Amino acid sequence: MAKLQEVIQHAYDNALGFKRQLDKACISPSDILTVKDLEKIPVLNKDRLPELQSADQPFGSLSAVKPSEMARIFMSPGPIYDPQSTEKDYWRFSEALRAAGFGEGDIVQNTFSYHLSPAGFMFDSALRELGATVIPAGTGNRELQIKVMKDVRVTGYVGTPSFFNLLLDAIEEKGWKAGKEIFVNKVFFTAEMLTEQMRKRCKDNGISVYEGYGTADCGCIAYEDKEGPGLKITDSAIVQICDPQTGSEVSDEEGEVVVTLFDKSYPLIRFGTGDLSRWVKGYEGKRIAGVLGRISDGVKVKGMFVREKQLAQVLNEEGYSVFQAAVTNENGQDQLKILIESEEGLEPGLASKIQDVVRVKPILELTAAGSIKKNDKKLVDNRNYELKRV
């Protein structure tokens, strides 16, 4: 508890945004004596970050150090600015990767983006902390990806399951075999739903599969370790499952994942991720049943959060006020399809303008006037989530 009290006092003294939050709720750092006392602090919802940061750039006065003292600054869709301090393994994913068997002697293909998004560096730093060699492959270009995988004898993969599925397709098209041309024996998936079908495909190829859960803001939150059901909560943060309306903890039902970090440079305390989960029965406070959905208008597509406000902003500026976006998963690949009502057709380059904002390439389709009702949701998730039976 001393560590928690220390970071709360430090945040109150050095992060004006957090001080305002406590003062508004008439709370003093000395009021927080136990983890249970954290409930006194209002949840800071992730969806508020763009507004807070816009009013006080770049971090909404939630950072306890100057931007110039950070190692890197990233921009996630929202936009949301995320800092990285000079601390090694800042996002604390090494414990998850260690549980997945990554370490010295491994050559790991990191297919998360190194451009603006923190995901690439997030796993790069964790892998280096474990002594693994990292190939900063980034996203896209599957032909080059599998060539590197073959030539360098890559042993591990970090990225999304959908992209690895594409790489397996490309490998099969080449006629390459595990143990002969391809030596990947372990994968760590995050940022997307992992289906049992994809898990089986990997295992059929002699590849051990692990998944993890984290966010750009909080880093590692939970991960698979094969020692129990669901995902093990990280040892490096306090994780609560809370009622989205009241912020109170719940023990036997779904709720929002709320995280408190011990990071003194960017002390996110009672941070509401917007993700829904629940405790695994019999493992309350220790294991969660993965991500079961979202409580806000943000939907994760190909590892990126897409928000209704972002889509509306782009489409309204281009003269398309009536639309509906739907997220589906076909053959293991997330797709963002947008139905648009227009009497004049769709402007060339519209898809690119949307992609520039949400970082996901959409499929656009013209639809008849009146087919989208006024009260229809603008952004729907039609994917079939395979809930963990734990």
Give the predicted meaning of each segment.
Residues 210-215, 327, 365-366:
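Beta-strand->loop->alpha-helix junctions that form or flank phosphate-binding loops
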Residues 107-110, 258, 339:
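Short, well-ordered beta-strand segments
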Residues 17, 21, 166-167, 197-198, ...:
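Phosphate- and divalent-cation-binding pockets in alpha/beta enzyme and binding domains
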Residues 1-99, 103-104, 332-337, 344-375, ...:
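Nucleotide 5′-phosphate-binding alpha/beta core
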Residues 157, 262-360, 376-377:
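AMP-binding/adenylate-forming catalytic core of the ANL superfamily
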Residues 185, 194-283, 297:
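Conserved AMP-binding/adenylate-forming
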Residues 154-163, 230-238, 382-390:
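A polyampholytic, Gly/Pro-enriched intrinsically disordered region
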Residues 36, 44-205, 228:
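Active-site phosphate/ATP/adenylate-binding loop shared across adenylate-forming ligases
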